Swiss-Prot record:
Quaternary structure and partners: NDH-1 is composed of 14 different subunits. Subunits NuoA, H, J, K, L, M, N constitute the membrane sector of the complex.
Molecular function GO terms recorded: NADH dehydrogenase activity; oxidoreductase activity, acting on NAD(P)H, quinone or similar compound as acceptor; quinone binding
Organism name: Syntrophotalea carbinolica (strain DSM 2380 / NBRC 103641 / GraBd1)
Cellular-component GO terms for this entry: plasma membrane
Pfam families in UniProt: NADHdh
Protein family: Belongs to the complex I subunit 1 family.
E.C. number(s) listed in UniProt: 7.1.1.-
Location in or out of the cell: Cell inner membrane
Keywords associated with the record: Cell inner membrane, Cell membrane, Membrane, NAD, Quinone, Translocase, Transmembrane, Transmembrane helix, Ubiquinone
Protein name, as recorded: NADH-quinone oxidoreductase subunit H
Gene: nuoH
InterPro entries, per database record: NADH_UbQ_OxRdtase_su1/FPO, NADH_UbQ_OxRdtase_su1_CS
Length: 330
């Protein structure tokens, strides 16, 4: 078997394993969130379908598939149908460059634990996060509903604003690792994670990805008491389900980005690297759920002021301090 064919087979196998794992993880993350929030609110959460509610994601899938798929009469039909797919597909494509562990030795060759190890993997992730805005904005615009349109506009303004802060937060990481490759960035943290090396950048990035996820306290695009359900007000059936799955896939992507850039990736004692990676990503997801259950929603003016007046200046200051430190160190 020639090398090209073997490489292609390995890529297909890795693609299938990654997609199957992240889709299953996203489904059960919904269940975990409902269980955790139930306990925080002194409720049981879902516990009827299967042992302890373990089959609840399957029941939810069947329910969404059986619901009528309605399209508003005055909606832009094709854009309305395309928007949920954009949100889901951009989240799935992001997993192509995320390294889940150290390379394995298989068939006398090194097998990277990543579908495609790009030299510009970090730029690829940011490009996809920018494209994800279109799914939300187009979904709100195409619905021909004032509530959906306002939700879409809010989401677009929020995501663009906090993407700037997120981009500024990763500059010190790139300066330290001297590479846009996610694998190289993880390997640069073998002795010390970037969370300790760049604590201010870690704080900025953490807040920015919380805003990118559109979850409490940054859930202005879906503020129920103001906008019914925000940008997906007019969606039903599996199209609503695609937005829902896309949200949790995006949560896993953002947790993976935080793990790779600041938490040391797969590095950790005793356990295999992929186990440490999963533990860190799930820890970030639990933090997001905990914040959702305990924090109130910000006002829209507070949200935008915090992004532009606090995070962006802090990000610029952090870049200058990091550059001065690197020059002084030589």
């Amino acid at each position: 078997m020639n090398d090209t064919l073997l490489t292609l087979i390995l890529i297909v196998i890795k693609l299938g394993l990654v997609l199957g794992t992240v889709l299953t993880l996203a489904a059960y993350m919904v269940l975990a969130e409902r269980k955790i929030l139930g306990r925080m609110q002194m409720r049981y959460g879902p516990n009827r379908v299967g042992w302890g509610g373990m089959l609840q994601p399957l029941a939810d899938l069947i329910k969404l598939l059986c619901k009528e798929d309605l399209i508003p009469q005055r909606a832009d039909r094709w854009v309305f149908m395309l928007a949920p797919a954009i949100s889901t597909i951009t989240a799935l494509l992001a997993f192509a460059v995320i390294p889940f562990g150290a390379p394995l030795q298989l068939f006398d060759r090194s097998l990277p634990m990543v579908i495609c190890d790009l030299n510009i993997g970090l730029l690829y992730l940011f490009a996809l996060s920018s494209l994800a805005v279109y799914g939300v904005a187009l979904g709100g615009w195409a619905s021909h509903s004032k509530y959906a349109l306002l939700g879409g506009l809010r989401a677009m303004a929020q995501m663009i604003s906090y993407e700037l802060a997120m981009g500024l937060a990763i500059v010190p990481v790139v300066m330290t690792a001297r590479s846009f490759s996610l694998t190289a960035i993880v390997e640069a943290q073998q002795s010390l994670p970037n969370m300790l090396r760049h604590p201010l950048a870690f704080f900025i990035f953490l807040v920015a990805i919380m805003a990118e996820s559109k979850r409490t306290p940054f859930d202005m695009p879906e503020a129920e008491n103001e906008l019914v359900a925000g940008f997906h007000t007019e969606y039903s059936g599996m199209r609503f389900g695609m937005f829902f799955v896309g949200e949790y896939l995006n949560l896993i992507v953002l947790g993976s980005m935080l793990t790779v850039l600041f938490l040391g990736g797969w590095y950790g004692p005793l356990l295999p690297g992929i186990c440490w990676f999963l533990i860190k990503v799930l820890g970030v997801a639990f933090f997001f759920i905990w914040v959702r259950g305990t924090m109130p929603r910000l006002r829209y003016d507070q949200l935008m002021a915090f992004g532009w007046k606090i995070l962006v200046p802090l990000g610029l200051l952090n870049i200058l301090v990091t550059a001065a430190w690197l020059i002084w160190r030589g």
